[in-house]
Regions:
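A short acidic, Gly/Pro-enriched loop at the edge of an enzyme's catalytic core
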Residues: 112-123
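A structural alpha-helix within SAM-dependent methyltransferase catalytic domains
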Residues: 48, 71-74, 137-144
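Conserved class I S-adenosyl-L-methionine
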Residues: 2-55, 68-72, 91
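Conserved catalytic/acceptor-binding region of the Class I
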Residues: 137, 144, 150-218
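A short SAM/SAH-binding and catalytic strip from SAM-dependent methyltransferases
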Residues: 123-136, 159
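Class I SAM-dependent methyltransferase SAM/SAH-binding core
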Residues: 58-113
Length: 219
């Protein structure tokens, strides 16, 4: 058992119906990182460029959210098929209303039970999503099932110390409000980090780690 497995799993229903009922909260977080990350980074482009694309792959972006990976992915696989999957209907609705980038197909999909056939994808993108999945090993087993032999899982996450300073300040304030541990800010991302993720991945995948070091710096 890794230390991360002892952290409480998030409530899937609450995530879908509250935290990700629409795309506004996630859009704000993405824009915050775009404005204040030092050094600046186009994260989708950076992550996608860690892999050598042929140009004709079938790719699932699970937890697609605002669809920020779809357009840059299309640039890299002009002849490929792209599926943007998300458990949150509200996110898919907002994405469709704003126009789906990359001519992608949208799919209501649970990472723990992917509605896709065995060996149907060449690559799966899971960016900042695996720590939200209640049963991480099950989700990774599903990814392994859906991937073709030689396929790739691009699992993007943060380090364990992600925004530690801000987390301490926020949790001190929450403690004064007598909130429960369930509401402590910053706990969920620690379930699958750069450090703890290897223990989850190595049973089914050959793992290569790529690091991008940055910080949020506010004026």
């Amino acid at each position: 058992m890794t230390p991360a497995t002892r952290l409480a799993a998030p409530d899937k229903t609450r995530l879908v119906n509250e935290s990700y009922a629409n795309d506004e909260p996630l859009s704000v977080r993405i824009e915050t990182h775009r404005r204040y990350s030092v050094p600046p980074v186009d994260l989708p482009a950076w992550a996608l460029d860690r892999y050598a694309w042929r140009g004709d792959e079938t790719v699932l972006d699970i937890g697609t959210g605002t669809g920020q990976y779809l357009a840059p992915l299309r640039e890299r696989i002009p002849r490929g098929r792209i599926v943007g999957g998300d458990l949150a209907i509200g996110m898919l609705r907002d994405l469709r209303a704003k126009g789906v980038p990359g001519d992608a197909r949208l799919l209501n999909a649970d990472a723990e039970a992917l509605p896709l056939a065995d060996e149907s994808c060449d690559a799966i993108i899971a960016s900042y999503v695996l720590f939200f999945v209640p049963d991480i090993p099950r989700a990774l087993a599903e990814a392994h099932r859906v991937l073709r032999p030689g396929g790739a899982l691009l699992a993007v996450t943060m380090a364990h110390v992600y925004m530690d300073e801000l987390r301490v300040v926020v949790n001190r304030a929450l403690a004064k409000l007598d909130t429960s541990n369930e509401t402590r800010w910053g706990v969920v991302p620690r379930r699958f980090t750069l450090e703890s993720g290897l223990a989850y991945l190595e049973p089914n995948f050959h793992v290569t780690v790529h690091r991008h070091e940055s910080a949020l710096v506010f004026p």
